[in-house]
Protein backbone atom coordinates (compact mmCIF):
# COMPACT_ATOMS: atom_id res chain seq x y z
CA UNK A 1 0.00 0.00 0.00
CA UNK A 2 1.32 3.42 -1.07
CA UNK A 3 1.97 6.01 1.57
CA UNK A 4 1.04 9.66 0.99
CA UNK A 5 3.79 11.67 -0.68
CA UNK A 6 5.16 14.31 1.71
CA UNK A 7 5.15 17.97 0.62
CA UNK A 8 8.06 18.76 -1.64
CA UNK A 9 8.45 22.25 -0.04
CA UNK A 10 10.73 22.13 2.96
CA UNK A 11 10.50 24.73 5.76
CA UNK A 12 13.70 26.32 4.43
CA UNK A 13 12.23 26.61 0.94
CA UNK A 14 9.07 28.16 2.37
CA UNK A 15 11.11 30.78 4.22
CA UNK A 16 13.02 31.60 1.04
CA UNK A 17 9.77 31.97 -0.87
CA UNK A 18 8.36 34.31 1.78
CA UNK A 19 11.52 36.42 1.69
CA UNK A 20 11.27 36.65 -2.08
CA UNK A 21 7.66 37.79 -1.86
CA UNK A 22 8.58 40.44 0.71
CA UNK A 23 11.46 41.63 -1.47
CA UNK A 24 9.12 41.90 -4.46
CA UNK A 25 6.69 43.91 -2.35
CA UNK A 26 9.41 46.29 -1.21
CA UNK A 27 10.55 46.86 -4.79
CA UNK A 28 7.08 47.06 -6.32
CA UNK A 29 6.61 49.80 -8.92
CA UNK A 30 10.32 50.49 -8.63
CA UNK A 31 9.66 52.14 -5.26
CA UNK A 32 12.21 50.92 -2.69
CA UNK A 33 9.90 50.80 0.30
CA UNK A 34 12.88 49.74 2.40
CA UNK A 35 14.22 53.30 2.13
CA UNK A 36 10.85 54.70 3.19
CA UNK A 37 10.75 52.34 6.16
CA UNK A 38 14.28 53.41 7.10
CA UNK A 39 13.15 57.05 6.80
CA UNK A 40 10.46 56.37 9.41
CA UNK A 41 13.06 54.79 11.68
CA UNK A 42 15.40 57.76 11.17
CA UNK A 43 12.63 60.28 11.88
CA UNK A 44 11.62 58.47 15.06
CA UNK A 45 15.18 58.29 16.37
CA UNK A 46 15.88 61.92 15.47
CA UNK A 47 12.70 63.07 17.22
CA UNK A 48 13.64 61.17 20.37
CA UNK A 49 17.20 62.52 20.24
CA UNK A 50 15.92 66.09 19.79
CA UNK A 51 13.55 65.72 22.75
CA UNK A 52 16.34 64.29 24.91
CA UNK A 53 18.65 67.14 23.86
CA UNK A 54 16.01 69.78 24.61
CA UNK A 55 15.20 68.28 28.01
CA UNK A 56 18.90 67.95 28.82
CA UNK A 57 19.60 71.59 28.02
CA UNK A 58 16.62 72.71 30.12
CA UNK A 59 17.75 70.51 33.04
CA UNK A 60 21.29 71.90 32.97
CA UNK A 61 20.03 75.46 32.83
CA UNK A 62 17.75 74.81 35.82
CA UNK A 63 20.61 73.26 37.78
CA UNK A 64 22.76 76.28 37.00
CA UNK A 65 20.03 78.64 38.21
CA UNK A 66 19.58 76.63 41.42
CA UNK A 67 23.31 76.92 42.11
CA UNK A 68 22.99 80.70 41.79
CA UNK A 69 20.01 80.80 44.14
CA UNK A 70 22.09 79.22 46.90
CA UNK A 71 24.64 82.06 46.65
CA UNK A 72 22.15 84.92 46.30
CA UNK A 73 23.12 86.48 49.65
CA UNK A 74 26.75 86.99 48.62
CA UNK A 75 26.93 89.13 45.47
CA UNK A 76 30.66 88.65 44.66
CA UNK A 77 30.28 84.90 45.19
CA UNK A 78 27.14 84.94 43.05
CA UNK A 79 29.00 86.51 40.11
CA UNK A 80 31.88 84.07 40.55
CA UNK A 81 29.57 81.06 40.55
CA UNK A 82 27.66 82.43 37.53
CA UNK A 83 30.92 82.74 35.60
CA UNK A 84 32.40 79.40 36.68
CA UNK A 85 29.29 77.28 36.10
CA UNK A 86 28.91 78.47 32.52
CA UNK A 87 32.67 78.41 31.88
CA UNK A 88 33.02 74.78 33.01
CA UNK A 89 30.05 73.64 30.93
CA UNK A 90 31.35 75.50 27.89
CA UNK A 91 34.87 74.12 28.28
CA UNK A 92 33.44 70.61 28.44
CA UNK A 93 31.72 71.16 25.09
CA UNK A 94 34.77 72.75 23.44
CA UNK A 95 37.06 69.98 24.71
CA UNK A 96 34.87 67.18 23.36
CA UNK A 97 34.72 68.80 19.93
CA UNK A 98 38.38 69.63 19.64
CA UNK A 99 39.60 66.30 21.03
CA UNK A 100 37.28 63.76 19.42
CA UNK A 101 35.30 65.24 16.49
CA UNK A 102 36.32 68.66 15.13
CA UNK A 103 33.58 68.43 12.50
CA UNK A 104 31.02 68.62 15.34
CA UNK A 105 32.01 72.24 16.05
CA UNK A 106 29.83 75.12 14.95
CA UNK A 107 26.41 74.67 13.44
CA UNK A 108 26.98 71.35 11.71
CA UNK A 109 24.66 72.26 8.85
CA UNK A 110 27.56 72.99 6.44
CA UNK A 111 28.97 69.57 7.36
CA UNK A 112 25.73 67.89 6.26
CA UNK A 113 25.75 69.93 3.05
CA UNK A 114 29.31 68.80 2.40
CA UNK A 115 28.39 65.18 3.14
CA UNK A 116 25.53 65.35 0.64
CA UNK A 117 28.11 66.38 -1.97
CA UNK A 118 30.46 63.54 -0.92
CA UNK A 119 33.02 66.13 0.17
CA UNK A 120 32.87 65.67 3.94
CA UNK A 121 33.05 62.45 5.99
CA UNK A 122 30.21 61.30 8.23
CA UNK A 123 31.74 59.70 11.33
CA UNK A 124 28.49 59.16 13.17
CA UNK A 125 30.08 57.02 15.89
CA UNK A 126 32.10 60.09 16.94
CA UNK A 127 29.83 62.98 15.98
CA UNK A 128 26.66 61.73 17.68
CA UNK A 129 28.01 61.60 21.27
CA UNK A 130 30.25 64.65 20.82
CA UNK A 131 27.55 66.86 19.29
CA UNK A 132 24.94 65.73 21.80
CA UNK A 133 26.95 66.10 25.00
CA UNK A 134 29.07 68.99 23.72
CA UNK A 135 25.91 70.86 22.74
CA UNK A 136 24.45 70.16 26.18
CA UNK A 137 27.49 71.85 27.68
CA UNK A 138 27.47 74.98 25.56
CA UNK A 139 23.71 75.52 25.40
CA UNK A 140 23.23 74.43 29.01
CA UNK A 141 25.83 77.01 29.99
CA UNK A 142 23.70 79.80 28.52
CA UNK A 143 25.78 80.54 25.42
CA UNK A 144 24.10 82.43 22.58
CA UNK A 145 23.52 79.42 20.34
CA UNK A 146 20.57 77.56 18.86
CA UNK A 147 19.49 73.96 19.27
CA UNK A 148 18.80 73.48 15.54
CA UNK A 149 22.47 73.12 14.59
CA UNK A 150 23.01 70.12 16.87
CA UNK A 151 19.68 68.50 15.97
CA UNK A 152 20.26 68.88 12.22
CA UNK A 153 23.76 67.40 12.41
CA UNK A 154 22.63 64.70 14.82
CA UNK A 155 19.75 63.95 12.47
CA UNK A 156 21.97 63.61 9.42
CA UNK A 157 24.37 61.37 11.31
CA UNK A 158 21.50 59.20 12.58
CA UNK A 159 20.46 58.80 8.95
CA UNK A 160 23.92 57.54 8.08
CA UNK A 161 23.98 55.31 11.18
CA UNK A 162 20.71 53.62 10.18
CA UNK A 163 22.07 53.19 6.65
CA UNK A 164 25.17 51.43 7.99
CA UNK A 165 23.31 49.28 10.53
CA UNK A 166 20.89 47.93 7.95
CA UNK A 167 23.64 47.77 5.33
CA UNK A 168 21.71 49.61 2.66
CA UNK A 169 23.90 50.28 -0.35
CA UNK A 170 23.81 52.84 -3.10
CA UNK A 171 24.22 56.59 -3.38
CA UNK A 172 20.47 57.18 -3.48
CA UNK A 173 19.86 55.51 -0.12
CA UNK A 174 22.83 57.26 1.51
CA UNK A 175 21.86 60.67 0.18
CA UNK A 176 18.17 60.24 0.98
CA UNK A 177 18.66 59.18 4.60
CA UNK A 178 21.19 61.96 5.24
CA UNK A 179 18.71 64.55 3.96
CA UNK A 180 15.83 62.91 5.83
CA UNK A 181 17.69 63.03 9.13
CA UNK A 182 18.66 66.68 8.64
CA UNK A 183 15.08 67.71 7.82
CA UNK A 184 13.74 65.73 10.77
CA UNK A 185 16.27 67.44 13.03
CA UNK A 186 15.13 70.93 12.10
CA UNK A 187 11.47 69.97 12.35
CA UNK A 188 11.95 68.56 15.85
CA UNK A 189 14.05 71.51 17.00
CA UNK A 190 11.31 74.05 16.26
CA UNK A 191 8.14 71.92 16.14
CA UNK A 192 7.93 73.03 12.52
CA UNK A 193 7.45 70.11 10.09
CA UNK A 194 6.84 72.16 6.96
CA UNK A 195 9.90 74.31 7.67
CA UNK A 196 11.97 71.13 8.00
CA UNK A 197 10.89 70.01 4.53
CA UNK A 198 11.46 73.44 2.98
CA UNK A 199 14.85 73.69 4.67
CA UNK A 200 16.12 70.70 2.69
CA UNK A 201 14.51 71.81 -0.57
CA UNK A 202 15.56 75.47 -0.32
CA UNK A 203 18.67 75.82 1.85
CA UNK A 204 20.27 72.58 0.61
CA UNK A 205 19.00 72.93 -2.96
CA UNK A 206 22.50 72.63 -4.52
CA UNK A 207 23.09 69.35 -2.66
CA UNK A 208 19.62 67.79 -2.41
CA UNK A 209 18.81 65.33 -5.19
CA UNK A 210 15.12 65.88 -5.69
CA UNK A 211 13.47 62.58 -6.62
CA UNK A 212 10.11 61.05 -5.82
CA UNK A 213 11.76 58.65 -3.39
CA UNK A 214 13.86 61.28 -1.61
CA UNK A 215 10.98 63.69 -1.09
CA UNK A 216 8.72 60.88 0.18
CA UNK A 217 11.43 59.87 2.63
CA UNK A 218 11.88 63.45 3.85
CA UNK A 219 8.12 63.78 4.39
CA UNK A 220 8.00 60.53 6.38
CA UNK A 221 11.04 61.40 8.48
CA UNK A 222 9.70 64.85 9.31
CA UNK A 223 6.28 63.45 10.24
CA UNK A 224 7.79 60.91 12.61
CA UNK A 225 10.19 63.36 14.28
CA UNK A 226 7.40 65.91 14.80
CA UNK A 227 5.13 63.24 16.29
CA UNK A 228 7.90 62.29 18.73
CA UNK A 229 8.36 65.95 19.69
CA UNK A 230 4.66 66.52 20.25
CA UNK A 231 4.21 63.36 22.31
CA UNK A 232 6.57 64.84 24.90
CA UNK A 233 5.84 68.57 24.46
CA UNK A 234 2.15 68.79 23.47
CA UNK A 235 0.75 70.38 20.32
CA UNK A 236 1.38 74.04 21.03
CA UNK A 237 3.30 76.79 19.24
CA UNK A 238 6.92 76.91 20.35
CA UNK A 239 6.81 80.67 20.93
CA UNK A 240 3.63 82.15 22.41
CA UNK A 241 3.23 85.74 21.24
CA UNK A 242 -0.57 85.73 21.11
CA UNK A 243 -2.68 86.60 18.08
CA UNK A 244 -1.51 89.83 16.49
CA UNK A 245 -3.61 92.04 14.23
CA UNK A 246 -3.35 91.77 10.47
CA UNK A 247 -1.40 94.35 8.48
CA UNK A 248 -3.62 96.73 6.44
CA UNK A 249 -2.83 96.86 2.73
CA UNK A 250 -1.85 100.53 2.88
CA UNK A 251 0.94 99.69 5.37
CA UNK A 252 2.67 96.94 3.37
CA UNK A 253 5.25 99.38 2.00
CA UNK A 254 6.60 99.73 5.52
CA UNK A 255 7.43 96.01 5.56
CA UNK A 256 9.36 96.44 2.32
CA UNK A 257 11.46 99.13 4.01
CA UNK A 258 12.04 96.75 6.92
CA UNK A 259 13.16 94.11 4.42
CA UNK A 260 15.59 96.56 2.86
CA UNK A 261 17.12 97.22 6.29
CA UNK A 262 17.64 93.50 6.81
CA UNK A 263 18.95 93.16 3.26
CA UNK A 264 21.69 95.63 4.15
CA UNK A 265 22.43 94.15 7.57
CA UNK A 266 22.42 90.47 6.53
CA UNK A 267 25.57 90.48 4.35
CA UNK A 268 27.34 92.71 6.89
CA UNK A 269 26.48 90.23 9.63
CA UNK A 270 27.88 87.37 7.53
CA UNK A 271 31.15 89.24 7.06
CA UNK A 272 31.35 89.83 10.79
CA UNK A 273 30.87 86.10 11.45
CA UNK A 274 33.66 85.13 9.07
CA UNK A 275 35.91 87.92 10.33
CA UNK A 276 35.36 86.85 13.93
CA UNK A 277 36.24 83.27 12.96
CA UNK A 278 39.58 84.50 11.63
CA UNK A 279 40.21 86.66 14.69
CA UNK A 280 39.46 83.91 17.20
CA UNK A 281 41.55 81.42 15.23
CA UNK A 282 44.50 83.78 15.54
CA UNK A 283 43.88 83.88 19.29
CA UNK A 284 44.04 80.12 19.88
CA UNK A 285 46.15 79.21 16.84
CA UNK A 286 44.75 75.69 16.77
CA UNK A 287 46.13 74.88 20.22
CA UNK A 288 43.59 72.77 22.11
CA UNK A 289 44.40 74.27 25.53
CA UNK A 290 44.09 77.86 24.32
CA UNK A 291 40.94 77.01 22.40
CA UNK A 292 39.23 75.41 25.40
CA UNK A 293 40.27 78.27 27.72
CA UNK A 294 39.00 80.81 25.19
CA UNK A 295 35.70 78.92 25.01
CA UNK A 296 35.51 78.91 28.79
CA UNK A 297 35.99 82.68 28.88
CA UNK A 298 33.23 83.20 26.31
CA UNK A 299 30.94 80.80 28.15
CA UNK A 300 31.67 82.49 31.48
CA UNK A 301 30.87 85.88 29.95
CA UNK A 302 27.51 84.54 28.79
CA UNK A 303 26.90 83.18 32.28
CA UNK A 304 27.52 86.62 33.80
CA UNK A 305 25.29 88.28 31.22
CA UNK A 306 22.58 85.74 31.93
CA UNK A 307 22.50 86.99 35.51
CA UNK A 308 23.08 90.72 34.94
CA UNK A 309 21.10 91.12 31.68
CA UNK A 310 19.19 87.90 30.89
CA UNK A 311 17.89 89.20 27.56
CA UNK A 312 21.42 89.27 26.15
CA UNK A 313 22.28 85.59 26.68
CA UNK A 314 20.85 82.22 25.73
CA UNK A 315 19.30 81.14 22.45
CA UNK A 316 16.68 83.89 22.54
CA UNK A 317 13.38 82.00 22.68
CA UNK A 318 12.52 83.58 26.04
CA UNK A 319 13.36 87.03 24.68
CA UNK A 320 11.13 86.89 21.59
CA UNK A 321 7.67 87.04 23.25
CA UNK A 322 8.82 89.76 25.66
CA UNK A 323 10.16 91.93 22.84
CA UNK A 324 7.11 91.30 20.65
CA UNK A 325 4.81 92.40 23.47
CA UNK A 326 6.59 95.78 23.58
CA UNK A 327 7.99 95.41 27.09
CA UNK A 328 11.32 97.07 26.25
CA UNK A 329 12.09 100.73 25.70
CA UNK A 330 13.87 101.84 22.55
CA UNK A 331 17.13 102.32 24.44
CA UNK A 332 16.88 98.83 25.92
CA UNK A 333 16.17 97.33 22.49
CA UNK A 334 19.28 98.98 21.07
CA UNK A 335 21.37 97.69 23.97
CA UNK A 336 19.99 94.14 23.61
CA UNK A 337 20.57 94.17 19.86
CA UNK A 338 24.18 95.35 20.10
CA UNK A 339 24.96 92.99 22.99
CA UNK A 340 23.41 89.99 21.25
CA UNK A 341 25.21 90.72 17.99
CA UNK A 342 28.51 90.64 19.89
CA UNK A 343 27.69 87.51 21.90
CA UNK A 344 26.32 85.72 18.82
CA UNK A 345 29.52 86.46 16.92
CA UNK A 346 31.71 85.32 19.82
CA UNK A 347 29.80 82.10 20.53
CA UNK A 348 29.12 80.93 16.99
CA UNK A 349 32.43 81.98 15.44
CA UNK A 350 34.45 80.30 18.19
CA UNK A 351 33.47 76.85 16.95
CA UNK A 352 31.20 75.97 19.87
CA UNK A 353 28.76 73.15 19.10
CA UNK A 354 25.53 75.04 18.50
CA UNK A 355 23.43 76.67 15.82
CA UNK A 356 22.80 80.22 14.72
CA UNK A 357 19.13 80.01 13.65
CA UNK A 358 17.70 80.84 17.09
CA UNK A 359 20.09 83.76 17.77
CA UNK A 360 19.28 85.22 14.35
CA UNK A 361 15.55 84.86 15.00
CA UNK A 362 16.03 86.80 18.25
CA UNK A 363 18.09 89.51 16.53
CA UNK A 364 15.46 89.84 13.81
CA UNK A 365 12.74 90.17 16.42
CA UNK A 366 14.56 92.89 18.35
CA UNK A 367 15.38 94.91 15.23
CA UNK A 368 11.84 94.44 13.91
CA UNK A 369 10.36 95.61 17.21
CA UNK A 370 12.56 98.72 17.23
CA UNK A 371 11.50 99.52 13.66
CA UNK A 372 7.87 98.94 14.61
CA UNK A 373 8.09 101.34 17.55
CA UNK A 374 9.47 104.02 15.25
CA UNK A 375 6.75 103.66 12.60
CA UNK A 376 4.02 103.52 15.26
CA UNK A 377 5.15 106.98 16.40
CA UNK A 378 5.60 108.32 12.86
CA UNK A 379 2.29 107.02 11.47
CA UNK A 380 -0.32 107.03 14.25
CA UNK A 381 -3.12 107.15 11.66
CA UNK A 382 -2.34 103.53 10.67
CA UNK A 383 -3.04 102.17 14.18
CA UNK A 384 -0.10 99.78 13.90
CA UNK A 385 1.26 97.19 16.33
CA UNK A 386 5.03 97.03 16.78
CA UNK A 387 4.65 93.29 17.32
CA UNK A 388 3.68 92.69 13.69
CA UNK A 389 7.03 94.11 12.59
CA UNK A 390 8.75 91.93 15.19
CA UNK A 391 7.21 88.80 13.62
CA UNK A 392 8.07 89.99 10.11
CA UNK A 393 11.64 90.69 11.20
CA UNK A 394 12.12 87.26 12.80
CA UNK A 395 12.57 85.46 9.51
CA UNK A 396 14.02 88.38 7.55
CA UNK A 397 17.55 88.09 8.94
CA UNK A 398 17.51 84.37 8.10
CA UNK A 399 16.39 85.26 4.59
CA UNK A 400 19.19 87.78 4.12
CA UNK A 401 21.94 85.77 5.82
CA UNK A 402 21.46 82.17 4.70
CA UNK A 403 19.37 83.06 1.61
CA UNK A 404 16.39 80.90 2.56
CA UNK A 405 13.34 83.20 2.64
CA UNK A 406 10.70 80.46 2.36
CA UNK A 407 12.20 78.50 5.23
CA UNK A 408 12.39 81.62 7.38
CA UNK A 409 8.78 82.61 6.67
CA UNK A 410 7.26 79.18 7.27
CA UNK A 411 9.45 78.57 10.31
CA UNK A 412 8.22 81.75 12.00
CA UNK A 413 4.60 81.08 11.07
CA UNK A 414 4.73 77.57 12.55
CA UNK A 415 6.57 78.73 15.67
CA UNK A 416 4.25 81.67 16.45
CA UNK A 417 0.92 80.51 14.96
CA UNK A 418 0.30 83.92 13.34
CA UNK A 419 -0.58 82.82 9.82
CA UNK A 420 -2.50 86.03 9.12
CA UNK A 421 0.86 87.84 8.82
CA UNK A 422 2.08 85.76 5.89
CA UNK A 423 1.79 88.60 3.34
CA UNK A 424 3.91 91.17 5.26
CA UNK A 425 6.38 88.41 6.06
CA UNK A 426 6.72 87.51 2.38
CA UNK A 427 7.29 91.16 1.48
CA UNK A 428 9.89 91.61 4.22
CA UNK A 429 11.70 88.36 3.39
CA UNK A 430 11.68 89.02 -0.34
CA UNK A 431 13.02 92.54 0.11
CA UNK A 432 15.77 91.28 2.41
CA UNK A 433 16.79 88.47 0.05
CA UNK A 434 16.80 90.55 -3.13
CA UNK A 435 18.87 93.36 -1.64
CA UNK A 436 21.32 90.94 -0.01
CA UNK A 437 21.80 89.23 -3.37
CA UNK A 438 22.06 92.56 -5.21
CA UNK A 439 24.81 93.78 -2.88
CA UNK A 440 26.86 90.65 -3.54
CA UNK A 441 26.27 88.90 -0.24
CA UNK A 442 26.72 85.13 -0.22
CA UNK A 443 24.81 82.59 1.90
CA UNK A 444 26.50 82.09 5.26
CA UNK A 445 26.50 78.29 5.25
CA UNK A 446 27.96 78.19 1.73
CA UNK A 447 30.79 80.46 2.84
CA UNK A 448 31.51 78.32 5.90
CA UNK A 449 31.47 75.11 3.83
CA UNK A 450 33.83 76.64 1.27
CA UNK A 451 36.25 77.55 4.07
CA UNK A 452 36.03 74.05 5.54
CA UNK A 453 36.72 72.42 2.18
CA UNK A 454 39.65 74.76 1.51
CA UNK A 455 41.12 73.87 4.92
CA UNK A 456 40.57 70.17 4.25
CA UNK A 457 42.32 70.42 0.89
CA UNK A 458 45.26 72.28 2.43
CA UNK A 459 45.61 69.63 5.16
CA UNK A 460 45.51 66.81 2.59
CA UNK A 461 48.14 68.57 0.49
CA UNK A 462 50.38 69.07 3.54
CA UNK A 463 50.06 65.39 4.48
CA UNK A 464 50.88 64.25 0.96
CA UNK A 465 53.95 66.49 0.87
CA UNK A 466 55.09 65.18 4.25
CA UNK A 467 54.59 61.59 3.09
CA UNK A 468 56.54 62.14 -0.12
CA UNK A 469 59.32 63.88 1.81
CA UNK A 470 59.61 60.95 4.23
CA UNK A 471 59.80 58.50 1.33
CA UNK A 472 62.64 60.45 -0.28
CA UNK A 473 64.72 60.44 2.92
From Swiss-Prot:
Cellular localisation: Cell inner membrane
GO cellular component: plasma membrane
Cytoplasmic topological domain: 1-32, 117-123, 167-176, 202-214, 282-287, 439-473
Subcellular location, principal: membrane
GO molecular function: antiporter activity; voltage-gated chloride channel activity
Site features described as Mediates proton transfer from the protein to the inner aqueous phase, chain residue numbers: 203
UniProt motif Selectivity filter part_3: location: 355-359
Catalysed reaction equations from the record: 2 chloride(in) + H(+)(out) = 2 chloride(out) + H(+)(in)
Name of the featured protein: H(+)/Cl(-) exchange transporter ClcA
Amino acid sequence: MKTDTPSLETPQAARLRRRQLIRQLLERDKTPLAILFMAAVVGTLVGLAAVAFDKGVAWLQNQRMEALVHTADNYPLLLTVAFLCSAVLAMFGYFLVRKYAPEAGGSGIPEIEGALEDQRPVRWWRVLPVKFFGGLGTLGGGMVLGREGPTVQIGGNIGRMVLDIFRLKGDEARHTLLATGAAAGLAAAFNAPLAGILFIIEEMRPQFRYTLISIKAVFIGVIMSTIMYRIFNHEVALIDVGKLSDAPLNTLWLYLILGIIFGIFGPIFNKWVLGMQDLLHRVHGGNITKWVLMGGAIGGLCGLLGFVAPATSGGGFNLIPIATAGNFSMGMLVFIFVARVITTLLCFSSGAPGGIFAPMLALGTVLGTAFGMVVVELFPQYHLEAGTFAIAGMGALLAASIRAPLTGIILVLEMTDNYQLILPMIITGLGATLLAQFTGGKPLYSEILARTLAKQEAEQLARSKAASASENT
